[in-house]
Amino acid sequence: MQEEFDIIVIGSGLGGLECGVMLSREGMGVCIVEQAAVPGGCLQSFRRRGHSIDTGMHYVGSMQQGGIMRRYFDYFGIGDSLEIRPLDEAFDIVSPGGAGEFAYMHGYDEFRRHLTSLFPREAAGIARYCDKIREIGDSIGVEVHRSGRLSSGGVKYLGASAAEFIGECVADPLLRSVLAGTNPLYGGVRERSPLYHHAMINHSNIEGACRFAGGTQHIADALAARIREHGGTILTGCRASALHTEGRRITGVELADGDRKSTRLNSSHIL
């Protein structure tokens, strides 16, 4: 088999599928190569005893109507095909060092009110924290992207420390740990994690943390369906084993199926 495509995407995780949707809907010939049996990457779900269990994305923020993630899903053409359910009012519970359970509440007003009720002496610092997190989070709004700029107001916080910012806002060691309690969501490391990452994750979830009823495999399936509708191709069970080049230009991908076959797809762009 030998086919030519405008774009070849290696891997069908969320990023690969999103690229496939955007490029195929613009009329490009897209082929996605995936070594697993089904597309999705960390979006894949599995079933045990009649229950669907997600492997990677358990909940996602900014999925409320008008939220930036919801707008992206609508742009991809899948927003209305997914069963999106908001999490409970207390969308997350953190327990730093086993010192008790502390809820993260939906909405900035409730988030601030709840933490202030637990740490009344830190009211001003909690307010400062919320204001800055919201400011950074709003820097990736849809209107910013429409202007052709990439989060110009927030990128400067990539060089700021999340831990230092939290320490500047509040003095109580326990509250500092509570505010940093979601760091596993972004692989947070005290010495290195930037304020930008911390703010984007917490802002997104405070604004609109939701889950996908039936599992996140539905996201992958819906994106894959859009790609095929736009004429794209998704090859599953196909491992990319080599890139072919001519001079300094990549010209194709070689696919290997054990020792039995090797298929080369020629393309001008590899993602």
List each language-model region with its residue ranges:
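N-terminal glycine-rich phosphate/pyrophosphate-binding loop and immediately adjacent elements
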Residues: 2-132
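Generic recognition of stable, solvent-exposed alpha-helical segments in well-folded globular domains
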Residues: 18, 64, 68, 110, ...
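General beta-strand structural signal in soluble alpha/beta enzymes
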Residues: 34, 53, 177-178, 235-236, ...
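Rossmann-like flavin
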Residues: 97-193
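Helical element adjacent to the flavin cofactor pocket in flavoenzyme catalytic cores
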Residues: 199-250, 254-256
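Single conserved hydrophobic/aromatic residue that forms the stacking wall/gate
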Residues: 261, 265-271
